[in-house]
């Protein structure tokens, strides 16, 4: 770790994980795995016929407090593919005045396939968090990614919100910016920005088309008792947004959408990660 990083995070813990994947002998393999602090690869499974690895990322402390930072840097070399997930939710606890930070960057060379499908992120009352996620997607590459954001603790009542959450998402395509967006939530605007709901979920997929958009919209409208959700197509980026108060229900919705679109985006039948079944 550099002196600059050490100085920047002297008030908290740094967890850093850098992964490279490459195609070797017909199998996508982890060719580089470098970690700093309590953040590492828990397990690599080869459950699929084409030898796509399912990789579980583990942060043993189970949560972040003010001053902590997690950095995930993933590179896929040409023609490789991987599914990345986590065994548990990312938890952001009450702040000591400092921000908890997560930084994700995914670099996809040509003709790769990435699925970044972690468990939810939970922002507890009085937490302060910054999350920055960037996808750099070269020509011919495919991505499905989702995340579910839970603001506050439903069991503690309606007034328990995070102090501040600042989330950046950047999707950079080979020939265009793709998508850039920012969500800022705090104690004062949480109810207004989320329409009274406590959970916001986002899924995006590249490349997509009108046929896939139609399937997702049909799926959303066919679900009984579903509260708020929608899907749109921004050039070749499918964007799905869901709101609700039941985290298990929304998680099932995300998994159902992923299961439906995977054959069209990734090009093969969906196979659930084992950890989703526990």
UniProtKB/Swiss-Prot annotation:
It comes from the Bacteria. GO terms for molecular function: nickel cation binding. It holds the Pfam family UreD. InterPro entries: UreD. Keywords: Chaperone, Cytoplasm, Nickel insertion. It is found in: Cytoplasm. Its main location: cytoplasm. PANTHER family: UREASE ACCESSORY PROTEIN D (PTHR33643:SF1). Belongs to the UreD family. Required for maturation of urease via the functional incorporation of the urease nickel metallocenter. UreD, UreF and UreG form a complex that acts as a GTP-hydrolysis-dependent molecular chaperone, activating the urease apoprotein by helping to assemble the nickel containing metallocenter of UreC. The UreE protein probably delivers the nickel. This is Urease accessory protein UreD. It comes from Blochmanniella pennsylvanica (strain BPEN).
């Amino acid at each position: 770790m550099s002196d600059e990083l050490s100085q920047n995070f002297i008030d908290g813990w740094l967890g850093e994980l850098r992964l490279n994947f490459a195609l070797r002998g017909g199998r996508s393999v982890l060719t580089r795995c470098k970690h700093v602090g309590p953040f590492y690869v828990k397990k690599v499974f080869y459950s699929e016929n084409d030898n796509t690895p399912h990789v579980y990322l583990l942060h043993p402390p189970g949560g972040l407090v003010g001053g902590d930072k997690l950095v995930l840097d993933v590179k896929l070399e040409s023609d490789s593919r991987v599914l990345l997930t986590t065994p548990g939710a990312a938890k952001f606890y009450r702040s000591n005045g400092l921000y908890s930070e997560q930084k994700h960057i995914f670099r996809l060379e040509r003709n790769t396939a990435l699925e970044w499908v972690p468990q939810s992120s939970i922002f507890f009352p009085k937490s302060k968090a910054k999350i920055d996620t960037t996808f750099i997607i070269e020509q011919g590459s495919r991505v499905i990614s989702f995340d579910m954001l839970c603001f506050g603790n439903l069991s503690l009542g309606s007034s328990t919100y995070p102090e501040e959450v600042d989330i950046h998402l950047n999707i950079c395509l080979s020939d265009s910016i793709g998508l850039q967006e920012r969500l800022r939530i705090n104690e004062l605007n949480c109810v207004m920005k989320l329409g009274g709901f406590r959970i916001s979920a986002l899924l995006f997929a590249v490349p997509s088309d009108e046929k896939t958009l139609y399937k997702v919209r049909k799926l959303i409208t066919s679900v009984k008792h579903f509260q708020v959700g929608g899907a749109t197509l921004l050039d070749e980026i499918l964007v799905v947004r869901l709101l609700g108060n039941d985290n298990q229900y929304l998680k099932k919705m995300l998994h159902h959408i992923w299961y439906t679109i995977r054959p069209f985006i990734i090009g093969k039948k969906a196979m659930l990660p084992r950890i989703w079944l526990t």
